[in-house]
Amino acid sequence: MAAKATSEKGFKTITDNRRARHEYHVIETYEAGIALSGTEVKSLRAGKANLQDAFARVENGEMMLYNLHISPYEQGNRFNHEPKRTRRLLMHKQEILRLYGKVREKGLALIPLKVYFNPRGKVKVQLALAQGKKSYDKRHDIAARDAKRDMDRAMRERQKM
């Protein structure tokens, strides 16, 4: 019925891109609004969205979001939306130009991390300026996570004694 989770501040997370943190080094995060149709908002309220292959790009001075899959609204009829259409992100012009310069210069990517409702009920996208990880970076992160897990487990066992 509603979105997945509600925090104490009133933010309701619709969908997370957990794979993005595994595939990319997140450098900075930004918040952007998103231009949606009525059936898209209703479908998002039901939690029917997927960020798996989504990315953002600056095109003709506007920030666009590609491959965000929002399932068609079940009660919608002939006015229903296309699931993977390109959607416009709402950001200040200066912010868009700054991001465009960073993406062009350094070979960075704009990846959506999550889609959520803010306390006022508006749909927002958290974008990350990110750089792709190499396979050895991924292995290093996995090894560090395993070592931390083992250390925590040992500390818990020691406290039980």
UniProtKB/Swiss-Prot annotation:
Gene Ontology molecular function: RNA binding
PROSITE patterns registered for this protein in UniProt: SSRP (PS01317)
Keywords, sorted A to Z: Cytoplasm, RNA-binding
Main localization category: cytoplasm
InterPro entries: SmpB, SsrA-bd_prot, SsrA-bd_prot_CS
Subcellular location: Cytoplasm
Pfam families in alphabetical order: SmpB
Disulfide topology: none
GO biological process: trans-translation
One GO location term (cellular component): cytosol
Known function: Required for rescue of stalled ribosomes mediated by trans-translation. Binds to transfer-messenger RNA (tmRNA), required for stable association of tmRNA with ribosomes. tmRNA and SmpB together mimic tRNA shape, replacing the anticodon stem-loop with SmpB. tmRNA is encoded by the ssrA gene; the 2 termini fold to resemble tRNA(Ala) and it encodes a 'tag peptide', a short internal open reading frame. During trans-translation Ala-aminoacylated tmRNA acts like a tRNA, entering the A-site of stalled ribosomes, displacing the stalled mRNA.
Family indicated by similarity: Belongs to the SmpB family.
Full protein name: SsrA-binding protein
Species assigned in the record: Desulforamulus reducens (strain ATCC BAA-1160 / DSM 100696 / MI-1)
Gene: smpB
